[in-house]
Amino acid sequence: MSIITDVYAREVLDSRGNPTLEVEVYTESGAFGRGMVPSGASTGEHEAVELRDGDKSRYGGLGTQKAVDNVNNIIAEAIIGYDVRDQQAIDRAMIALDGTPNKGKLGANAILGVSIAVARAAADYLEIPLYSYLGGFNTKVLPTPMMNIINGGSHSDAPIAFQEFMILPVGAPTFKEALRYGAEIFHALKKILKSRGLETAVGDEGGFAPRFEGTEDGVETILAAIEAAGYVPGKDVFLGFDCASSEFYDKERKVYDYTKFEGEGAAVRTSAEQIDYLEELVNKYPIITIEDGMDENDWDGWKALTERLGKKVQLVGDDFFVTNTDYLARGIQEGAANSILIKVNQIGTLTETFEAIEMAKEAGYTAVVSHRSGETEDSTIADIAVATNAGQIKTGSLSRTDRIAKYNQLLRIEDQLGEVAEYRGLKSFYNLKK
């Protein structure tokens, strides 16, 4: 009754209006699962391959019909007949069927859509929530949200190099209250921006994208919004950055060239100067997390940054690790970073995603479950965050339904868990010296 009988993919649109995949899996019993695949704008060069058609006459070359066909004509034939509950066997079968180190043959987007749909179908077959199916009886930790309320870099047209300015409501007693803190700060920020005559249009991840005078202007404005909403920076709410440094790192000159986003007159920093600058910001403001502070291939820079700041700030590898256990293992061995960003489409299966989270935790690294800038209404990452007791999630600002869908799912999960639910706030940063 739990045997897979049909697998079907179709092309749908993501939050940027670009094509992506939706996959459906059916079993003999009638159990059903559906998975939708996100897409990134700033992508690490070592990520698994997102298969696009390249036909410029259709969606500007971004169509996903090849990936859809790979699901319907190749993957479906290979996994029909499997027990839907055997997630690892199905994921391994798809990896073997692809046969490349980066899933470049079938496409990570094709494989991931099936992987998610299989898990959802199994949960439906067992008549339990997805987080319970994935995590078992010890599932209880609601994640501390990283809320991206200012968008810069590749996620907006604002002249700021850093891609994300985030708030983290660590002082809230529950996830529900943490979400309220964030929403109130978001609206306070909007009022401040309007009062200054700045734009309140939002970027890809739902944050504002105003023309600030620079990074520190953005930080000071966020701090003012936190206080205007009635909260205390550095107690109720901390700050975080996603620098996305690979987006403005000049490989030939080996410098961090802020002029790419901030224009003529902006800083051009060496690796050592980049570390000094980040330390300066950390010493000045209540910053608890920095993502991709160094370029993805600047291993010496990452190690130096970790040695300098790794005891007091969470240093998250996104493009640096690309949710890949090979890169994470090297980082652990060399003492580079102290946290990994978990993006399911960077690696391509739920099995490999869970392996990366487990490896990080065993090494004392934190794991931050994350969305992509091109999202859908699929809320699987909310269930993954709770299933793994990851303790942190990054899923955008307090606007756009593609972001709110994840927050609303976490509210449902917190309700369903009842008294068992834990919101750990600052304790989610377990590898820092408070």
UniProtKB/Swiss-Prot annotation:
Keywords: Cell wall, Cytoplasm, Glycolysis, Lyase, Magnesium, Metal-binding, Secreted
Location of the active site: 205 (proton donor), 343 (proton acceptor)
Entry GO terms, CC: cell surface; extracellular region; peptidoglycan-based cell wall; phosphopyruvate hydratase complex
Protein purpose: Catalyzes the reversible conversion of 2-phosphoglycerate (2-PG) into phosphoenolpyruvate (PEP). It is essential for the degradation of carbohydrates via glycolysis.
NCBIfam families the UniProt entry points to: eno
Catalysed reaction, written as an equation: (2R)-2-phosphoglycerate = phosphoenolpyruvate + H2O
Gene this chain is encoded by: eno
Protein known as: Enolase
Family per similarity comment: Belongs to the enolase family.
Co-factor(s): Mg(2+)
SMART domains: Enolase_C, Enolase_N
Cofactor details (free text): Binds a second Mg(2+) ion via substrate during catalysis.
Gene3D superfamilies: Enolase-like C-terminal domain, Enolase-like, N-terminal domain
Places the protein is found: Cytoplasm; Secreted; Cell surface; Secreted, Cell wall
Principal location class: cytoplasm
GO biological process: glycolytic process
